[in-house]
Amino acid sequence: MISPQKSIHYGRYEFKKWEQVDAETIVEAPVSLTVNGEVWLTFMCTPVDLEAMAVGFLYNENIIQHIDEVADARLCEHGDNVDVWLNRSVEQPKSWRRTSGCAGGLTAVETLARVDVSFNPHKPKFDPEKISALVENLFESQELYRETGGVHTSVLSD
């Protein structure tokens, strides 16, 4: 099984000083969806409630209209594939219409394997005060974030 969290060690800048922190972080992992024995796609997701996520995805994409159409939904032994069997045959859509998120919520696992996400072991080469000011500026400019408390966003600075 894939754990939904992992321990990390990082440097945190707070109150004008650096400190080393041990903490837990949420994991995102590639999890494939197999429908009636055929691999359909791979999600990037936090690996919890995967059977429900898979069935919900099929409902959201209008593949199924009712839970009674699902004969079985089972997480594989390693936790990286959800196998859903429907009580009827279905064809895999050519595209996904309703899934939101970056890249439609889907990913190419081989692309992920090429990404280097390791931490830089060297001291930071940026001014933490500047980063704090930029984050504050970002939050000030995000009206929807202030209203809801959560929005994916990005910033570019020199």
What is each residue range found by the language model?
Residues 1-157:
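Intrinsically disordered, low-complexity regions enriched in acidic/Ser/Thr/Pro/Gln residues
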